[in-house]
């Protein structure tokens, strides 16, 4: 796996699924391929994206700044600086300085990542802030190692949260989660259907699913009533794909 592929993988792992994630993935691909050379426009676009947490925006801004060539006098962006200040905790800054001194002695991506994984997310963010604010300099490889270590820690905590959601025994949470997933699947079906002349069937199935969920939420139904809702939708989607000559079994 190449360095940039690894960085892209780690960064995308902390972004919630949805159309925005697909858009960010495309921007990252363009940046890493040298196709997007206007850093200021890129940062302005990032600043106004909804849903993303300030820290996620800070990490993306840091990655863009590392990768896109820019004029020396270009101002650092406040939204990135604020995100990478370790919540203003002096303890995080002290640890960030210690980590920075270690990273200065390292020259490899994997070495830097290994060292960085021993620190808290707050300290890692503060260390990125030091580098972003030009208070310290490391090689791009080392900076990317720091980015990936931070993303790994964030992804670990997100995964624990998802696992708790998936294994919860609370029937109301499970019921709502199934309905949310069904709506997300319906939206994906609509996007995949696109403008194809045979798309009306897929659009109708997706629309019916949305209406059913809306009715279930309005009336209030037994928590078991949503069981299998998403799977039914997926079966319909795969039957539609088969008729269209597309074989994809990756959604379950």
Curated annotation (Swiss-Prot):
KW Lipid metabolism (keyword) present: no
Molecular function via GO: RNA binding; structural constituent of virion
InterPro entries linked: Flu_matrix_M1, Flu_matrix_M1_C, Flu_matrix_M1_N, Flu_matrix_M1_N_sub1, Flu_matrix_M1_N_sub2, INFV_M1
Similarity section: Belongs to the influenza viruses Matrix protein M1 family.
Annotated spans, Membrane-binding: 1-164
Note, other: Most abundant protein in virion. When expressed alone can form virus-like particles in transfected cells.
Superkingdom assignment: Viruses
GO terms for biological process, alphabetical: viral budding from plasma membrane
RNP-binding: region residues: 165-252
The keyword RNA-binding is annotated on this UniProt entry: yes
Protein name per its UniProtKB record: Matrix protein 1
Protein keywords: Host nucleus, Membrane, RNA-binding, Viral matrix protein, Virion
Annotated motif Nuclear localization signal, positions: 101-105
Functional description taken from the UniProt entry: Plays critical roles in virus replication, from virus entry and uncoating to assembly and budding of the virus particle. M1 binding to ribonucleocapsids (RNPs) in nucleus seems to inhibit viral transcription. Interaction of viral NEP with M1-RNP is thought to promote nuclear export of the complex, which is targeted to the virion assembly site at the apical plasma membrane in polarized epithelial cells. Interactions with NA and HA may bring M1, a non-raft-associated protein, into lipid rafts. Forms a continuous shell on the inner side of the lipid bilayer in virion, where it binds the RNP.
Annotated signal sequence range: none
Membrane topology value: Peripheral membrane protein
Protein localization: Virion membrane; Host nucleus
Subunit relationships: Homodimer and homomultimer. Interacts with NEP. Binds ribonucleocapsid by both interacting with genomic RNA and NP protein. May interact with HA and NA. Cannot bind NP without genomic RNA.
GO cellular component: host cell nucleus; membrane; virion membrane
